[in-house]
């Protein structure tokens, strides 16, 4: 089967934003204008097409990123052929940053939505940082221009100041608030208006209003200057006073956007149907096709040192990244993949190169929100869902078994909060186990474990809302009613002293014995190393090299049990430098136990300390309640970092220990008569004060 759309006309994009910037409404309009959905879904009445989980519709926030395929030929059909958009809708709530992170990982470009009134909000910064991390080219869309207090150029200034990027507007707003009418197109130098009769489908172009002509000339000049910086040739032309053609300007802005040097900005009101078609035009004009970005990097499964890459080309060996697992009520498990190279037909065999397991692809579907279309094959650049994968987890690579590769893995954050869950009835025990297993497979930032001493099931995640929603899903999707314990902080531990410790495990009484012996130098890890920093300095084969991995494993396993109060050890440097072995009795198990015994002794010799998670907290409050809010944060052992005025109120930034923040949502509402809001995300681990250490060690007994 030949390719229906050339890869140069693919756009894999995400629509990302802060919670209330109007992202889901924007995605809805994208579907409406691209002709895929005939009734506009509104988040306000819980009917949006991409919010397909019941809780999302109730809470009005988007939790799972649905991948949707749509087509666009231009707002005025200015392109001869259609472009194929794969649009991923992502959550903006900070408890779901993992969802945003994994979507950005597989996108080629993003539309970042800001609210015209509140501008750059705390989580906009989080999302922006994630997009920087993966080098995603982006366009800024300032939405909600019809809202009270909306101001396009103020938001542009905020982006420059708070996000450190220089936005280049290619439009200006005509009017604002109730008087928002449309945009000035700085490329065509025309005013663009929208009709209610066709729900803002086709732009109506007119001359620029006289009172805005001067402003338009000024910003057109800024845009042309940004374009001229793309190359020496254009710069010389510009400096010599020659006019640049619109074609030259467009090509230059596209080049600089894809290189991540600039961010183009447009404006509109998705809810009032004023401007989304021009956002889609900008996606075609300025965001990259899969062939415009560097080849994906990876490594050889047999030797991580050997780096490899795959180009976006059908003739290269097949490779794809599983970026999301979802459980579907009708077909079971859906594995969403981004295909980077090659072709895959249904019925083909592939290998999961991370686990070394073979998989056979059953059916393949492309999603349109929660409707689906069966397809027979996928090619480089496609995003699709595979049905029938047995053992694939988010972030793993599927590839051609003869030419394996492991694509760059995703980083998943460590959970910071845990609660105990138990089923309400004995009969639900097994069902709960299955449900939690499925949820953990879908969401790598959610962990499940059994407490060996109490037998309780402990679930851990990124915040209270994260765990609430997972427990809620367990009830709805798997019919498991569960009781939830009080939230517990996930503490960590580290050592403060350097020490050398001998680990020796010897059993030699009749028959095959055991002999493992190693000397390990322990120290706090180097800056920036969070887990185990393992160094092998054994010389002369006093410990054969095949036993070194067992020593590392022994240390890693013992680190989980901590040295102060049973919490995992982090930031540990362990250097194995000496030891001995026995020709007959030594084996991997014996060295693993010896290393584990040495690590255990850190409790006496390592000067262990308890660490507590510190959260970056931002509270937005009317000025009247500022004193109360700050006083309360101080009482919670918070450190106030700063304050600033915004349209939405005073913004207080602080760092507060997570243990002091439980139930804060209710407290901050009652302090401010429901008018303050807050957001928080994990920042770092800090040494816990003595009274916390005392309480925690007592509790652990």
UniProtKB/Swiss-Prot annotation:
Main location: cytoplasm
Residues reported in the UniProt entry to bind GTP: 17-24, 89-93, 143-146
Domain of life: Bacteria
SUPFAM superfamilies: EF-G C-terminal domain-like, P-loop containing nucleoside triphosphate hydrolases, Ribosomal protein S5 domain 2-like, Translation proteins
Subcellular localization(s) per the UniProt record: Cytoplasm
CDD domains found in the cross-reference section: EF-G (cd01886), EFG_III (cd16262), EFG_mtEFG1_IV (cd01434), EFG_mtEFG_C (cd03713), EFG_mtEFG_II (cd04088)
InterPro entries: EFG_II, EFG_III, EFG_III/V, EFG_IV, EFG_V, EFG_V-like, EFTu-like_2, G_TR_CS
Domain tr-type G as annotated: residue spans: 8-291
Entry GO CC: cytoplasm
Purpose of the protein: Catalyzes the GTP-dependent ribosomal translocation step during translation elongation. During this step, the ribosome changes from the pre-translocational (PRE) to the post-translocational (POST) state as the newly formed A-site-bound peptidyl-tRNA and P-site-bound deacylated tRNA move to the P and E sites, respectively. Catalyzes the coordinated movement of the two tRNA molecules, the mRNA and conformational changes in the ribosome.
Family as reported in the entry's similarity comment: Belongs to the TRAFAC class translation factor GTPase superfamily. Classic translation factor GTPase family. EF-G/EF-2 subfamily.
Family matches, as NCBIfam families: EF-G, PRK12740.1-5, small_GTP
Name of protein: Elongation factor G
Species name: Pseudomonas syringae pv. tomato (strain ATCC BAA-871 / DC3000)
Taxonomic classification: Bacteria, Pseudomonadati, Pseudomonadota, Gammaproteobacteria, Pseudomonadales
